[in-house]
Every structure is written in C-alpha cells, then in structure tokens.
Design a protein with these regions (language model features):
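Gram-negative outer-membrane beta-barrel transporters
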Residues: 47-50, 68-171
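Residue-level recognition of strand-loop junctions within catalytic nucleotide-signaling folds
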Residues: 35, 49, 89, 200, ...
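Outer-membrane beta-barrel domain signature, strongest for Gram-negative TonB-dependent receptors
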Residues: 38-43
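Surface-exposed extracellular loop regions of Gram-negative outer-membrane beta-barrel proteins
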Residues: 1-28, 46-69, 166-178, 210, ...
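Conserved C-terminal beta-signal and adjacent last beta-strands/turns
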Residues: 23-30, 101-104, 132-243
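Generic structural detector for well-ordered beta-strands
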Residues: 19-21, 73-75, 242
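Transmembrane beta-strand segments of outer-membrane beta-barrel domains in Gram-negative
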Residues: 34, 59, 76-79
C-alpha cells in the first residue's frame, strides 16, 4: 500500500511502497533447556536467520519539514545471536518473604547485517537520494535487549506485585542519505511497577507506576541530539469488577 502515516516516536511521515515483496527467511535454531523443582528453569538459545529481500526503511529527502521514510526491499540480510531466559524463586535465600518472591528475565545479544542496492531502491520507491551505508545493521535492531522482573505473590492470593526493568541498545531509526550518517535511537531504561489487590473473587484494584526513572526517548545524529521525547512518570489507579 502507498498509504502514509506518522511514526508515533519521531512524528515523521512513513509511506508504503506498493511493489514491496514478501521476505523469504530461513531459520536455524539450537536450544538448551533445564527445568527444575518449583517451576524454576533456565534456557539458552542460539539463532541465525538468513533473509532474502528483507523489508527496510529508507529516507527520502524532504523539501520542507521532516524527512519522508519509505519502505523497500533490501537485497539480503542476516540476524544471529544468543538468548538466555530464566525463572527463579528466591526461597533459597531464606524464609519469610523470600518464599513469596521470584525473579524472571531474558537477555538477547545479537547482530545483523543487510545489503542494499542503491539503484534497486530508486526503482522501487523513486527516492533519488543516495543511501549512505549500503551495508549496515537492520533498522530498529538493537545489539542487546534486557528484560528483568522481580515479582511477589502473597500466600493468601490477595496481593501481587512486580517491578519490571527493560533496556535496549542503540538502534538505527532513520537511515542516512547523501553522505550523512544514520540516526540512532538511544538506549531507553524503563522501570515500571504494578501492584494488584484482590479484595474478593470479582474485584481487582491495580496501581501502576510507569517510567519510574523519568527517562527521555532520544534520537541522535553524529552525537548531536536530533529529537527528544519527555514522557515523565505516570501513576494510574484503577478498579475492576467482573460480573
């Protein structure tokens, strides 16, 4: 489709390309898993993806206002890395509250590469500007992603709480053109808290605190801040009753 929409992070327009073809992907995965008592587990996975005609973002020069981002097929691409996941209760530390606490998380460390053909991009999109980096990481790909959760469940089932931390490595958001480098979204450290109280079988009281660290989302170009979004810390209290 050639429809255009605004990216919610950058507010830049993104236009589709009618001739974009489906990406062919060959996956290779190797996984090791260990399940222990009380549901505790750990797993390690290796993966490799070989892609033909991966779908990528390219930048079209803007006459006035923000740049237009177009969607097109690159020539080839690959993604490879390792992922570790785990679930572990904290009862081994001691008695009391430790019996009600658990931690879970996953970390992915990976890399990617795509190859673009400038002339092919021009034929697909009509973009006249020369792509700066014809071999680079995939748009939106971070070399590391970390998700961690500390959870609590009460013995009587009336209370539960979780503290969740997420972070991703810098990633290309706007590919560069005409000799200018790519624009990168910087790591965003997200820390959220959710507490739930179940006074009876039908009711749930929920307290959410989002972005406790007060982090801003930032896009940089050559170590210069291109765009920043201030989100602040959000607090929400809700009540739900199921009939």
């Amino acid at each position: 489709s050639s429809a255009t929409y605004l990216d919610p992070l950058t507010a830049f327009p993104i236009a589709g390309t009618p001739g974009v073809s489906t990406t062919d992907i060959i996956n290779y995965d190797l996984r090791w898993e260990w399940y222990r008592e009380a549901g505790n587990n750990v797993s390690v996975g290796l993966f490799y993806k070989d892609m033909e005609a991966p779908i990528e973002s390219v930048q079209s020069p803007a006459q006035d206002g923000p740049p237009l981002i177009r969607i097109a097929n690159a020539e080839s691409g690959e993604v490879y890395g390792v992922e570790v996941e785990f679930l572990q209760d904290l009862a081994f530390i001691g008695d009391g509250i430790w019996d009600n606490l658990f931690t879970t998380g996953n970390i992915t460390v990976s890399d990617s590469e795509i190859v673009l053909d400038r002339q092919n991009i021009v034929e697909q999109t009509g973009v006249s500007a020369a792509i700066t980096n014809v071999e680079r990481r995939m748009t939106g790909h971070s070399q590391y992603v970390l998700n961690m959760q500390l959870g609590y469940d009460s013995d009587n089932g009336e209370h539960s709480a979780s503290l969740v931390y997420n972070v991703f490595g810098e990633r290309i958001l706007i590919p560069g053109i005409d000799g200018f480098d790519d624009n990168f979204e910087q790591p965003f450290h997200s820390l959220d808290m959710v507490y739930k109280y179940y006074p009876d079988f039908n009711s749930t009281v929920t307290l959410r605190v989002q972005n406790i660290l007060g982090e801003d989302r930032e896009i940089e170009f050559n170590d210069t801040l291109l765009r920043s979004e201030t989100r602040g810390t959000g607090i929400r209290l809700s009540y739900k009753y199921d009939f």
